[in-house]
Amino acid sequence: MLSDDATAALRARLDAADYTLDAVLDRLGEAGRRGLERNSTTPARDALGAPSADDPQATLARLWILQDAVEAVAVSSALGDVVGPLVAAGLLVPDDDAFRAAAVVRPYGAEATASTPAIAGWICHDPLPNLDGHAGAPRPDHVLGISPASTTLAQLSIRRPVASALDLGIGCGVQSLHLAAHADRIVATDLNPRALDLARITTRLSGVDADLRLGSLYDPVAAETFDLIVCNPPFVISPPAGARLTYREGDLPGDELVRRVLVEGAGKLNPQGTMQVLCNWAIVDGEPWDERLAGWLRPTGCDALVLQRE
């Protein structure tokens, strides 16, 4: 994957191109932003104007946000000596006299709150498979970018200062960017090696110090406890047979993965610690919707606040 030196050089190139959230959103305009929310790149492409090797901001937006094949001369002008390491790491793919992105680098940010400063950085994740109506299938180890679920968790998470935080299932790394604003120490885990590779780029580009570890659930932190645990697990309940996408559904039957996240997580909390999780759980005929969760959580001795939505 990308070395520390190459990541630092990439960040310098992103800064030089003004490839930041506010600048790019301003460049795309309202029509471009709304189009991308619908997975349509046409309004954004119009806003960026004609391709030019003298416009590194537009070049990077075309390469990573619109997922275009971009002329090699323009990519080289925007990224300079970083092109070689990106190709060697498999993050940039030659395509005749152009380059395509095999992983996306997007600017990210969040406004300051009463308890945390503003966040500014970049997120690295896999390309969107359905941009502009394309029907491409994601790779089994696909690393999802910013989603409504990850945004919801970031918005709901308690932001009081803590000494230690666990990002369980780091994915692209967005929760760790938020944790860095109020946690002295961050440990982040994932069973998907590609997720750790891309999250490492996310955290290093964004100046976040996180201890990234490979492993399933709480295995990588067996001897540790935390003040805060956040988790957006692969909670989709799917039929027992069929292919799985690592980011979406686990290998355990039904809602067993969610049960383990909650029950085992209770034992990983320090006194007065908090765990915040997005999840699905099975609702069984004849059983109140909350009884299944209560049966899991009562033996832990923890208080639980459950918000249910359709």
Role assignments for model-derived ranges:
Residues 193-194, 231-260:
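Mobile active-site "lid"/loop adjacent to the S-adenosyl-L-methionine
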Residues 192, 254-307:
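Conserved Class I SAM-dependent methyltransferase catalytic core
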Residues 200-201, 241-243, 289-291:
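Short amphipathic alpha-helical segments
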Residues 139, 147-231, 237, 282-284:
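Conserved SAM/SAH cofactor-binding pocket of Class I
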Residues 1-131:
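N-terminal auxiliary segments of SAM/dcSAM-dependent transferases
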